């Protein structure tokens, strides 16, 4: 269609249809094409593909007419319906000002032989004269004009920023699609239910996905029959169409694995091998649309953020089969302040206040899809747990039999990029997948319908969700193809088809992610193991200040544009963002200083842990190991700490997922052969970084080296200066030993090092050597948690944001405790900052696991072959001014003083339980479950000395832990939460199918796959805590020795347990002991650290209510 510019109107004309849009007030009118003769001096500007609508970017700016400037054919859906992607748009201001260069394709009819369109514009001489006149006027009234010019500049700047974001939304993310003949907003099943209709396409669309509804509103309101030609429904989402051939003999190397590859006609039609068309259509809801950290959870209309309906179409001959899934944010009121890496989620409203809006959301879903299977992929421990718990609680309160709730901790099952473990989920719910079926239509009509949908979510509803949806859709597709006879019954999908299918879903995930989380420029930072994230200071040099800028400023503009597109008021003052941007520079400097301090603290900690007493510390650096031998399909640069002593250097490898150093290598300086510095080895392109290669000998064998590069904050800095300084220090240190090392600057060769043989794992010591010490070892605790260091940073550096420094900066993140015993080396020296405040405890009944004062130079933990050596200061005999190490609950109960960070004490008394035992509760020891009601907090140490864990069945622990979690209110201190009160007798009944036998005779407790609880069973055994006196009264019990070792299933990360309890090998380990509140003493210790009040009494009414919810719930609750 042609675009004309007249004096008062812009005119779109296609055949006999013409649309007039006023340049004064933006009003629209549909007129005959012959009325073009009535326009004043119309000039053809070029060709356009259609109209999206009009919108006003700001009250100070004119309306803009948004037109489709360029489109691209995506493919053809069944019925030869062509689908197009909008690749370029043009925005024309509806004002009397002349439009700038629109770069439209020229109309051959009106621009024959003309390269550029003519314009209604003034001559150059007239323009010069007017400019001269204006300059004279400005000089005469300079003072008033200056202020107005400044305002105009700000207005122009704001217009440029908003216009730039509008162009990026449409052009950078491949997000908007349309079809002139097919309803992209409705699924095949909904179209079949609507039946054939003579109504125009835009009147049959699903209102949720009609993205330009508000922008085209003025045109629709004309209510003229001629309007139907101009209204084009547009969806935001993703569409890809591919034709696949089921050929088991064909090589997969020639597959077309990229959507950018142009469509090609098959050169040879082979009738032997069946063909089918697969299409993927994702539709994003226009309700609660926006960016990730601007739009979370549910709103007051029951709409959720990032709601996307994804339909997979299979077309064979005349048969079309459809399978639909949805994704959407957790429908509770929650938010994340996206101004730092991995911000902590926060619940905005209470559960009672949330209930009506949660119900409103699912009522609409049930009305549309009949039945829903919720698959919740959020982490069931750590930061995300608060969201998962709130979700489950709302499901119980809603109590709808049309819902099924499935909980699957994706990160635990698929740790280490083991995506094949998603099959654990699909196998567990295979019957549900089969019962859900799919929609099936042919030329005669509807054959069958899909009964329900899967509603999948993680925190962002991005990558985890996409992986799981692709896995479920693949199961359905194979069932469909086998049903149609396209695939043999016992054969999997051919490799070539599967690869193309994988790429389609990967493209879908990338596109949805760019729409919700950012632009395509950040695609390199997108990982398939979890939600989208920046690699942080230690990865690609992208510091937290850039992350802050990205979310704070860019997202503010983009969110404003999206709100304007949807017709929502802009809540943020866009002019105020200009002044906030100036603050960004100060924030950036402050963030850099904070990151440097955190690196220094981390190096100091590992210097104390790794270096023995007879070595002197000479320097430490945070570097990146970029050894080419590590590069593969899943390659990531590995963060390392390089520590230098007077006789050796240490390379400590930091595990990003475990948030700790899990391996290290000690290399003698005598074996350091040479140091090479030069550009990194690359296959293509110019090297981006400078690297340092440290060659060393292993015994008498050469060929070993580490390739390291520095962390650069400036993109123009290759880090060479830092590496040269490190090399010089290594050379000087070796010269002090009477030896020398050669430093060479050259281009590094792309070759592999021999496998390093001296790497020491932190889990290197046998489990049987810890023989019931009662704790997960203080050494492992200090290595994993850095709790004392965190307390010191918290007290002395309040302006340091620990969460920003990723991955090495996660000092404040308490990860889920594992049933592992980690050892660094036999003799470990630890320095703890001395507390100014003490924990009031009783000195009596100190267990055998407590530290004893053996003199001024050593302390020893009994029942442990490993010893702890302190500095040369004697231990005080009292329990004042000490740090209590409680690894059993993953905390340090300490109150570091605000003095100098360098002040430390050499010896520490650690009040630890002597024994942690597991029993089956078959003995009647319920009378010793709790401490006397009048016991003061100071008397809590009796329960710390020996802890006896009693439980009945997995169902008991599952329900009991949920009761405890429901009463626990999180506190924003390093991921710790306020402890729950101690259990008060039997509170949760047994499952009807639970076995009541003694756990001594059980080899393995079954893991509950479905929560079905009845209230008529009495005498249930619970997770209980016994005081010291009862610890020795039980029958033969196993010590910690039997439960601390990781099982074979743990080693590959493929086995995951309940979100509230770990059920493994005759024991149940509560996933978060800080929340279990095992003893009042631990409660008091946690409260002391967090400066929180002591826990209140048990709310029996709330507990009974929660128990009734479990027993009466009509929703299936499944834990995988």
Curated annotation (Swiss-Prot):
Comp. bias (Polar residues): 864-879, 998-1007
GO cellular-component term (any): early endosome
GO terms for MF: inositol monophosphate 4-phosphatase activity; phosphatidylinositol-4-phosphate phosphatase activity; protein homodimerization activity
Enzyme Commission numbers on file: 3.1.3.25
Catalytic activity line of the entry: a myo-inositol phosphate + H2O = myo-inositol + phosphate
Top EC group: hydrolase
Subcellular location field: Membrane, Clathrin-coated pit; Early endosome; Recycling endosome
Span of domain SAC: 167-518
Gene Ontology BP annotations: clathrin-dependent endocytosis; phosphatidylinositol dephosphorylation; regulation of endocytic recycling
PROSITE patterns: HSAC2, SAC
Basic and acidic residues composition bias: residue spans: 851-860
Record has Protein biosynthesis as a keyword: no
Region described as Disordered: 837-881, 979-1008
Job of this protein: Inositol 4-phosphatase which mainly acts on phosphatidylinositol 4-phosphate. May be functionally linked to OCRL, which converts phosphatidylinositol 4,5-bisphosphate to phosphatidylinositol, for a sequential dephosphorylation of phosphatidylinositol 4,5-bisphosphate at the 5 and 4 position of inositol, thus playing an important role in the endocytic recycling.
Protein name: Phosphatidylinositide phosphatase SAC2
Gene: inpp5f
């Amino acid at each position: 269609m042609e675009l004309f510019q007249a004096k008062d109107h812009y005119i779109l004309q296609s055949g006999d249809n013409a649309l007039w849009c006023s340049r004064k007030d933006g009003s629209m009118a549909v007129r005959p094409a012959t009325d073009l003769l009535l326009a004043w001096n119309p000039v053809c500007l070029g060709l356009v593909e259609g109209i999206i609508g009009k919108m006003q970017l700001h009250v100070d700016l004119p309306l803009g007419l948004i037109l489709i400037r360029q489109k691209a054919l995506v493919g053809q859906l069944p019925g030869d319906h062509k689908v197009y992607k909008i690749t370029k748009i043009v925005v024309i201001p509806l004002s009397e000002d002349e439009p700038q260069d629109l770069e439209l394709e020229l109309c051959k009819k009106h621009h024959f032989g003309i390269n550029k369109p003519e314009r209604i514009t003034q001559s150059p001489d007239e323009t010069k004269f007017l400019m001269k006149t204006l300059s004279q006027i400005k000089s005469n009234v300079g003072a008033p004009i200056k202020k107005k010019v400044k305002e105009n500049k700000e207005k122009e700047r704001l217009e440029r920023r908003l216009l730039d974001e509008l162009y990026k939304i449409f052009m950078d993310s491949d997000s908007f699609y349309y079809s002139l003949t097919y309803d992209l907003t409705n699924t095949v099943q909904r179209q079949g239910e609507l039946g054939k209709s003579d109504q125009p396409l835009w009147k049959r669309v699903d209102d949720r996905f009609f993205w330009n509804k508000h922008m085209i509103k003025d045109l629709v309101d004309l209510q003229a029959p001629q309007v139907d030609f101009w209204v084009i429904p547009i969806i935001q989402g993703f569409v890809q169409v591919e034709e696949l051939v089921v050929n088991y003999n064909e090589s997969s190397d020639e597959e077309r694995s990229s959507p950018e590859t142009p469509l090609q006609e098959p050169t040879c039609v082979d009738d032997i091998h069946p063909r089918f068309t697969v299409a993927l259509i994702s539709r994003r809801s226009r309700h609660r649309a926006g960016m990730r950290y601007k739009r979370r959870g549910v709103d007051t209309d029951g709409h959720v953020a990032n709601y996307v309906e994804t339909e997979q179409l299979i077309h064979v001959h005349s048969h079309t089969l459809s399978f639909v899934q949805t994704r959407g944010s957790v429908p509770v009121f929650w938010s994340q302040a996206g101004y730092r890496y991995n911000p902590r989620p926060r619940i905005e409203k209470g559960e009672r206040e949330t209930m009506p809006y949660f119900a409103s959301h699912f009522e609409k879903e049930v009305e549309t899809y009949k039945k829903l299977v919720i698959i919740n992929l959020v982490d069931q421990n750590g930061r995300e747990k608060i969201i998962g718990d709130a979700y489950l609680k709302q499901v119980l309160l809603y109590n709808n039999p049309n819902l099924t709730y499935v909980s699957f901790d994706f990160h635990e099952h698929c740790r280490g990029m083991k995506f094949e473990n998603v099959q654990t989920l699909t196998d567990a719910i295979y019957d549900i997948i089969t019962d859900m079926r799919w929609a099936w239509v042919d030329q005669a009509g509807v054959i069958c319908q899909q009964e329900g949908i899967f509603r999948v979510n993680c925190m962002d509803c991005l990558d985890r969700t996409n992986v799981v949806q692709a896995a479920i859709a693949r199961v359905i597709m194979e069932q469909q193809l086998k049903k149609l006879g396209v695939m043999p019954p016992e054969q999997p999908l051919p490799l070539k088809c599967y690869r193309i299918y994988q790429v389609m879903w990967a493209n879908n995930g990338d596109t949805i992610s760019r729409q919700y989380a950012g632009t395509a420029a950040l695609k390199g930072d997108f990982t398939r193991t979890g939600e989208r994230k920046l690699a942080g200071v230690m990865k690609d040099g992208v510091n937290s200040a850039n992350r802050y800028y990205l979310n704070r400023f860019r997202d503010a503009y983009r969110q404003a544009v999206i709100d304007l597109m949807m017709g929502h008021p802009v809540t943020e003052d866009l002019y105020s963002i200009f002044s906030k941007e100036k603050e960004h520079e100060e924030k950036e400097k402050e963030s850099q200083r904070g990151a440097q301090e955190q690196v220094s603290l981390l190096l100091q900690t590992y210097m104390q842990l790794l270096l023995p007493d007879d070595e002197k510390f000479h320097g430490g650096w945070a570097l990146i190991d970029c050894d080419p031998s590590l590069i593969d399909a899943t390659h990531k640069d590995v963060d390392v700490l390089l520590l230098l002593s007077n006789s050796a250097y240490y390379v400590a490898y930091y595990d990003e997922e475990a948030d700790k150093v899990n391996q290290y290598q000690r290399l003698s300086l005598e074996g350091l052969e040479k140091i090479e510095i030069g550009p990194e080895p690359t296959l293509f392109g110019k090297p981006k970084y400078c690297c340092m290669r440290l060659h060393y000998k292993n015994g008498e064998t050469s060929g070993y080296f580490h390739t390291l590069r520095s962390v650069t904050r400036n993109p123009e800095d290759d880090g060479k200066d830092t590496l040269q300084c490190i090399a010089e220090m290594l050379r000087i240190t070796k010269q002090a030993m009477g030896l020398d090392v050669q430093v060479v600057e050259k281009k590094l060769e792309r070759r592999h090092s021999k496998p390093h043989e001296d790497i020491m794992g932190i889990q290197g010591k046998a489990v049987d050597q810890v023989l019931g010490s009662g704790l997960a070892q203080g050494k492992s605790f200090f290595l994993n948690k850095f709790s004392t260091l965190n307390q010191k940073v918290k007290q002395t550096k309040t302006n340091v944001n620990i969460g920003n420094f990723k991955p090495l900066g996660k000092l404040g993140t308490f990860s889920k405790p594992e049933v592992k015993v980690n050892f660094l080396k036999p003799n470990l020296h630890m320095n703890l900052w001395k507390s100014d405040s003490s924990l009031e405890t009783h000195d009596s009944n100190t267990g055998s696991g407590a530290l004893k004062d053996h003199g001024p130079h050593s302390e020893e933990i009994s029942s442990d072959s490993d010893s702890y050596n302190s500095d040369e200061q004697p231990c005080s005999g009292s329990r004042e001014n000490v740090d209590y190490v409680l690894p059993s609950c993953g905390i340090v109960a300490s109150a570091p003083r605000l003095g100098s960070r360098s002040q430390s004490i050499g010896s520490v008394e650690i009040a630890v339980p002597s024994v942690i035992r597991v029993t089956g509760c078959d003995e009647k020891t319920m009378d010793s479950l709790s401490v006397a009601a009048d016991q003061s907090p100071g008397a809590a140490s009796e329960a710390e000395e020996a802890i006896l864990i009693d439980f009945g069945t997995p169902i008991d622990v599952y329900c009991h832990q949920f009761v405890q979690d429901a009463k626990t209110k999180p506190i924003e201190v390093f991921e710790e939460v306020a402890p729950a009160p101690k259990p008060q007798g039997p509170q949760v009944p047994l499952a009807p199918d639970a076995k009541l036998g003694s756990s001594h005779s059980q080899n393995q407790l079954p893991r509950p796959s479905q929560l079905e609880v009845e209230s008529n069973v009495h005498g249930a055994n619970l997770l209980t805590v016994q005081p010291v006196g009862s610890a020795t009264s039980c029958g033969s019990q196993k010590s910690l020795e039997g439960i601390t070792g990781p099982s074979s299933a743990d080693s590959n990360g493929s086995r995951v347990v309940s979100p509230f309890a770990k059920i493994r090998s005759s024991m149940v380990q509560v996933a978060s002991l800080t929340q279990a509140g095992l003893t009042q003493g631990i409660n008091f210790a946690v409260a002391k650290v967090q400066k929180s009040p002591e826990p209140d009494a048990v709310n029996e009414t709330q507990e009974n209510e929660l128990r009734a919810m479990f027993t009466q719930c009509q929703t299936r609750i499944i834990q995988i």
